[in-house]
Amino acid sequence: MIIGLHHAQITIPKGAEERGRHFYCDILGLEEIEKPDSLKGRGGFWLQVGDRSVHVGTEDGFDRRTTKAHIAYLVENLSDWKNALEQHGIQILEGVPIPGFDRFEFRDPFGNRVEMIQEV
């Protein structure tokens, strides 16, 4: 029986960890958490998101801009997030409406699709 979600993983290009940290920690405000010693040599970094984590791994060889795969961050005050991201030059794409939520999406600096979603 599956009892929950432990973590999700996204990827960035090999060697792009500092750019990734800047975007995910400085711009989005997520907290970096320590990776286990056994995984530190593999590149990437981990982020705390509420009571779960997002693992940012490194991987080359594909175009992240062509995939629909994404992660959705549950937020408060969606319009504040939209304004903050636009101030950083990030293009906002309106999401297809779904009942009970407002949302939008954008691409991170590496092409990963990211969604911000708020309950209404």
Task: State what each model feature region is.
Residues R64-L85:
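Mid-chain, well-packed structural core segment of small domains
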Residues Y24:
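Terminal peptide-recognition signature
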Residues E31-R65, R113-Q118:
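Conserved short beta-strand elements that form part of the metal-binding/catalytic scaffold
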Residues M1-I3, N83, Q87-V120:
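Vicinal oxygen chelate
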Residues G43-F45, A69, G100-F104:
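Short beta-strand micro-motifs in enzyme catalytic cores
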Residues M1-R21, A69-I71:
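N-terminal beta-strand motif that seeds the catalytic metal site of vicinal oxygen chelate
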Residues I3-G4, D63-K68, I98:
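Short glycine-enriched loop/turn motifs at secondary-structure junctions
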Residues G29-P36, I90-V96:
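Short secondary-structure junctions
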